[in-house]
């Protein structure tokens, strides 16, 4: 865990490894990616998918969801103990789309979970390869982050919907391990903690007995993860208070919401990694790419290079704009839902528009939609430049942002000033400043007030030409600072519903 003084790189978390050198990390990440690719190829063979059908992102997502379901131990156990009508706990499945006589058709498939586990293990040298499963979860989480807004969830826990830039990873399953914790935003963890505290307030036995002891350990562990994301001593000290509380209640909820707000200016470190759909890895493996030998990094040039030369298709609803669908998936691939649009647009080499202006719904197709009326089109996932993904909040400073989203959480390590509406955020800090955390609160507010809009974050960091694999010549972009920077501005996206 970050706070225990052992900072592992998130490639190491990703591969469950101990301290390794760079080459070993690149090889083990490559091994993980290659395993996903081999699994995908085998599933396409079993399902008799044509090359074109195998490149359809909707088919990729169905296959990914099947393997996640096959390995979801707790849910599988639950399903076996609580049988529900018409649901076979030993089977998993989903929609597969096939091209028949010039039309797309949906076929619902069912598979034995045991069979899918066999295919997955076989593709991963006989191992369970949990790292690969987590990688797939993070890709789904990034896709959700780009597609949906979490207004309802924020309001339910007493947070402000404008804090959406803190909600990265809010749909990641609990079982996503250290790699999952690394990509969760401050707001996501605050929300999990508040839910826990609220249960404790409503249920006297929540913290008691043997179960309560386990709950308490989980609570403290989550507090430590959140503490490890904060970069200032005062924020960390407040987290110690929350963690050590004998009987967490409303005071702790207040403290957590205060900390979440403070993270809009004093940003937490949240890891970003480019996680691509399984079909992209499958295509590369099928064309003879040896990921383990070549090595791979989730935060380097490799994902950009993969996307430069892989063709992925998507089903498009009759009134959707294929270019907008491409933007959505591009953002998901690079974990850039909360990045400044000016930065994303510069790297992509195309204008990136806010969520509210996109004429596209999510990638997945509901079972009641008519597939025959849909066409498929190529997703444009290429980029003009590449940049290193960051795991820090890029703190120094802030600047004017928009009505919908009042801060960003940077994805790319690229010099810019971070858009941010100081007046809006500071307005939330009037009032409650007494109690046991008052000195820390005062200190945090002071730091927020002294943050200067002109300051540059990621000083001297730039983007790179795609031919510059060793990242030797940074190109530092200049941005029009008055331009709209946030994605969820004026938002009308659908809510995320499980």
Curated annotation (Swiss-Prot):
Subcellular location: Virion; Host nucleus
Record's comment on post-translational modification: Late in virus-infected cells, may be cleaved from a 56-kDa protein to a 53-kDa protein by a cellular caspase. This cleavage might be a marker for the onset of apoptosis in infected cells or have a specific function in virus host interaction.
GO molecular function, one term: structural molecule activity
Region (Disordered): 1-22
Keywords for the protein's UniProt record, in alphabetical order: Capsid protein, Helical capsid protein, Host nucleus, Host-virus interaction, Ribonucleoprotein, RNA-binding, Viral nucleoprotein, Viral penetration into host nucleus, Virion, Virus entry into host cell
Sequence motif Unconventional nuclear localization signal, location on chain: 1-18
Coiled-coil region list: none
Keyword RNA-binding attached: yes
Biased composition (Basic and acidic residues): 8-22
Motif range (Bipartite nuclear localization signal): 198-216
Pfam family membership, one: Flu_NP
Disulfide bridge positions per record: none
Entry GO terms, CC: helical viral capsid; host cell; host cell nucleus; ribonucleoprotein complex; viral nucleocapsid
GO biological-process terms attached to the record: symbiont entry into host cell; viral penetration into host nucleus
Free-text function comment from the UniProt entry: Encapsidates the negative strand viral RNA, protecting it from nucleases. The encapsidated genomic RNA is termed the ribonucleoprotein (RNP) and serves as template for transcription and replication. The RNP needs to be localized in the host nucleus to start an infectious cycle, but is too large to diffuse through the nuclear pore complex. NP comprises at least 2 nuclear localization signals that are responsible for the active RNP import into the nucleus through cellular importin alpha/beta pathway.
Self-association state and partner proteins as the record states: Homomultimerizes to form the nucleocapsid. May bind host exportin-1/XPO1. Binds to viral genomic RNA. Protein-RNA contacts are mediated by a combination of electrostatic interactions between positively charged residues and the phosphate backbone and planar interactions between aromatic side chains and bases.
Similarity comment text for this entry: Belongs to the influenza viruses nucleoprotein family.
Protein name from the UniProt record: Nucleoprotein
């Amino acid at each position: 865990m970050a706070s225990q003084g052992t900072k592992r790189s998130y490639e190491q978390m990703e591969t469950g490894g101990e301290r390794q050198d760079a080459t070993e990390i690149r090889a083990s990440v490559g091994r993980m990616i290659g395993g996903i690719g081999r699994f995908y190829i085998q599933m396409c063979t079993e399902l008799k998918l044509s090359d074109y059908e195998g490149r359809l992102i909707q088919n990729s997502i169905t296959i990914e969801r099947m393997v996640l379901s096959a390995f979801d131990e707790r849910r599988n156990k639950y399903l076996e103990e609580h049988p529900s009508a018409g649901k076979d706990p030993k089977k998993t499945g989903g929609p597969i789309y096939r091209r028949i006589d010039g039309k797309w058709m949906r076929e619902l498939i069912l598979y034995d979970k045991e069979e899918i586990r066999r295919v997955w293990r076989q593709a991963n040298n006989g191992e369970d390869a949990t790292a690969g499963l987590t990688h797939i979860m993070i890709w789904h989480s990034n896709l959700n982050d780009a597609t949906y807004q979490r207004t309802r969830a924020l309001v339910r826990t007493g947070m402000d919907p404008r804090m959406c830039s803190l909600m990265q990873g809010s749909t990641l399953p609990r079982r996503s391990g250290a790699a999952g914790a690394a990509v969760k935003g401050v707001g996501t963890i605050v929300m999990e903690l508040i839910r826990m505290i609220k249960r404790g307030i409503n249920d006297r036995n929540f913290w008691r007995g043997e179960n309560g002891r386990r709950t308490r350990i989980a609570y403290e562990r989550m507090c430590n993860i959140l503490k490890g994301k904060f970069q200032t001593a005062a924020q960390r000290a407040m987290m110690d208070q929350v963690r050590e509380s004998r009987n967490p209640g409303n005071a702790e909820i207040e403290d957590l919401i205060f900390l979440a707000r403070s993270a809009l200016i004093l940003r937490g470190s949240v890891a970003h990694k480019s996680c691509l759909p399984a079909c992209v890895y499958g295509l590369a493996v099928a064309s003879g790419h040896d990921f383990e030998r070549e090595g791979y990094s989730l935060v380097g040039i490799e994902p950009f290079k993969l996307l430069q030369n892989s063709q992925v298709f998507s089903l498009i609803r009759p009134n959707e704009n294929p270019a907008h669908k491409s933007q959505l998936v591009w953002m998901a691939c690079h974990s850039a839902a909360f990045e400044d649009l000016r930065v994303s647009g510069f790297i992509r080499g195309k204008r990136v528009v806010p969520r509210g202006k996109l004429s596209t719904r999510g990638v997945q197709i509901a079972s009641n939609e008519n597939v025959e009326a849909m066409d498929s089109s190529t997703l444009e996932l290429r980029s003009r430049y590449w940049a290193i993904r960051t795991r820090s909040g890029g703190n120094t400073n802030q600047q004017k942002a928009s009505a919908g989203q009042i801060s960003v959480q940077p994805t790319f390590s690229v010099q810019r000033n971070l858009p941010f509406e100081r007046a809006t955020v500071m307005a939330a800090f009037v009032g409650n400043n007494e109690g046991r955390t008052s000195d820390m609160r005062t200190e945090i507010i002071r730091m927020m007030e002294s943050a200067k809009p002109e300051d540059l974050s990621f000083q001297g960091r730039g983007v790179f030409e795609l031919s510059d694999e060793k990242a030797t010549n940074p190109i530092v972009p200049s941005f029009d600072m008055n331009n709209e920077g946030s994605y969820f501005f004026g938002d009308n996206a659908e809510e995320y519903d499980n």
